[in-house]
């Protein structure tokens, strides 16, 4: 074990390949899965404090949890892959809660009320810490596939669903996954432009106007952004000070770029995104210039598939009721466990569908007014926007050029069509 411990603590060599059970830990050292229980000072300290009945150090507990999370891995060809523990709760809790809710209608009310409250609590908990989590993406994907699995195993065998209807539901699930994959390709990041760089200099000490670029005491060549425009470009007095103020306000110290108009820095992803709309926890990614259209199509196909699937389920388990009323009145549905489970899943899908319908409505209204969700929040914070329809419509008046022009711009927007000017933007 001492040999394994010594091996796991040595520095990583970038030219040396990893075996299937080796990985680079969060400290940059080469480690092995067999050594997962070795050399954990933070865990030892937490156990010692617990054994001695001493108060725990919050930092040591968080470091111990981070170490445990870092060492939860599975063997892979190019090295052991880390397992995100936030993926585990949806895989276990969702089937358990739904099967418990199918036992009795009172349990169904309790579970279907507790589930969204728990998810909202976890959302605000993680959003406050500005941390990334795969919990919501895992919950969304597992809900989609688990509902489809129950549809195939519980509803289709009843004989009420035709082959054409099954093909439509299957195509809807497939299109939802395809457009989700396209959305996950990236929101479109802000890159340094050639016009924003004017010199390449090698520094032996950190300049006062530039962030440090020293790594391990070595000097590195850095490109200095045009954060201050010289007066010779315009020849007008006072332009230098104005340009300096604009450039400094839009300079992102984290990404080392000057943000163009309508771009913003996401604290969760740690990147600057072109035409940033919002960070969506359900896809674990930002929605920006490059993936906004595919994000909208993902929502649309999911909602159409979900609504159609719910109608088929209710028509199967409540044949004597209309689809619009069966969700609220379906007598004897709890007489059989299979029917109760299908009915419970229909209610769960309806709750999810209602939330995503609200999101789709907000997206359509924002696109119609040519405003992003981020711009709407900033305008409301600065009290410079008009609110209508109980806050569903937020009109800033900055970029709107009419309904058809706004939608044309959204459907045809590219990085080249974005305005090059700079505007003061806050972080999200």
Swiss-Prot record:
**Any one GO CC term of the record:** Golgi membrane
Q: Which residues form the signal peptide?
A: none
The residue ranges for the Cytoplasmic side of the membrane come to 1-82, 126-132, 182-294, 372-428
Q: Where is the DHHC domain?
A: 250-300
Give the enzyme's EC designation: 2.3.1.225
Q: Which residues lie on this side of the membrane: Lumenal?
A: 100-105, 154-160, 316-350
Q: Which UniProt keywords apply?
A: Acyltransferase, Golgi apparatus, Lipoprotein, Membrane, Palmitate, Transferase, Transmembrane, Transmembrane helix
State the superkingdom.
Eukaryota
Query: Its topology with respect to the membrane?
Result: Multi-pass membrane protein
Q: Which chain regions cross the lipid bilayer?
A: 83-99, 106-125, 133-153, 161-181, 295-315, 351-371
Task: Identify a single GO molecular function assigned to this protein.
Answer: protein-cysteine S-palmitoyltransferase activity
Please indicate if the UniProt record lists Lipoprotein as a keyword: yes
- Any GO BP: protein localization to plasma membrane
Which residue positions are annotated as catalytic?
A: 280 (s-palmitoyl cysteine intermediate)
Give the catalytic activity: L-cysteinyl-[protein] + hexadecanoyl-CoA = S-hexadecanoyl-L-cysteinyl-[protein] + CoA
Q: Name one Pfam family in it.
A: DHHC
How would you classify this enzyme at the top EC level? transferase
Query: Where is this gene product found?
Result: Golgi apparatus membrane; Golgi apparatus, trans-Golgi network membrane
The record's principal subcellular location, in a coarse class, is: Golgi
* Role this protein plays: Palmitoyltransferase that could catalyze the addition of palmitate onto various protein substrates and be involved in a variety of cellular processes.
Q: Tell what the record comments on domains.
A: The DHHC domain is required for palmitoyltransferase activity.
Family the UniProt entry places it in: Belongs to the DHHC palmitoyltransferase family.
**Name of protein:** Palmitoyltransferase ZDHHC23-B
What gene name is listed for this protein?
zdhhc23b
């Amino acid at each position: 074990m001492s040999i394994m411990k010594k091996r796991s603590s040595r520095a990583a060599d970038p030219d040396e390949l990893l075996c299937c059970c080796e990985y680079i830990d969060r400290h940059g050292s080469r480690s092995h899965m067999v050594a997962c229980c070795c050399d954990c000072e933070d865990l030892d300290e937490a156990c010692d404090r617990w054994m001695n009945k001493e108060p725990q150090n919050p930092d040591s507990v968080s470091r111990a949890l981070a170490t445990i999370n870092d060492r939860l891995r599975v063997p892979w060809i190019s090295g052991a892959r880390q397992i995100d523990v936030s993926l585990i709760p949806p895989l276990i809790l969702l089937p358990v809660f739904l099967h418990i809710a199918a036992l009795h209608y009172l349990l169904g009310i309790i579970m279907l009320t507790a589930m969204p409250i728990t998810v909202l609590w976890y959302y605000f908990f993680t959003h406050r810490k500005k941390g990334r989590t795969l919990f919501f993406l895992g919950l969304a994907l597992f809900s989609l596939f688990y509902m489809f699995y129950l549809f195939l195993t519980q509803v289709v065998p009843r004989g009420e669903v035709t082959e054409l209807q099954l093909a439509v539901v299957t195509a809807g699930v497939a299109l939802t996954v395809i457009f989700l994959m396209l959305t996950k390709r990236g929101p479109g990041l802000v890159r340094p432009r050639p016009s924003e760089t004017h010199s390449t200099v090698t520094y032996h000490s950190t300049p006062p106007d530039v962030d440090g670029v020293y790594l391990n005491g070595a000097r590195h060549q850095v490109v200095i952004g045009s954060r201050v425009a010289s007066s010779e470009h315009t020849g007008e007095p006072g332009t230098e000070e104005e340009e300096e103020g604009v450039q400094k306000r839009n300079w992102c110290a984290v990404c080392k770029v000057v943000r163009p108009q309508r771009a913003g820095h996401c604290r969760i992803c740690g990147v600057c995104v072109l035409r940033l709309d919002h960070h969506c926890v359900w896809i674990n990614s930002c929605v920006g210039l490059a993936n906004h259209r595919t994000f909208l199509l993902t929502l649309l196909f999911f909602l159409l598939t979900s609504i159609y699937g719910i109608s088929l389920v209710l028509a199967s388990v409540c044949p004597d009721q209309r689809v619009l009323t069966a969700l609220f009145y379906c007598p004897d549905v709890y007489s059989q466990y299979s029917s109760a489970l299908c009915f419970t899943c229909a209610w769960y899908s309806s709750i999810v569908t209602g939330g995503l319908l609200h999101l789709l409505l907000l997206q359509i209204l924002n696109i119609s007014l040519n405003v992003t969700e981020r711009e709407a929040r900033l305008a409301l914070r600065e009290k410079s926007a008009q609110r209508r329809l109980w806050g569903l419509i937020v009109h800033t008046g900055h970029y709107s050029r009419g309904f058809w022009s706004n939608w044309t711009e959204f459907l045809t927007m590219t990085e080249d069509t974005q305005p090059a000017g700079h505007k003061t933007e806050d972080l999200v």
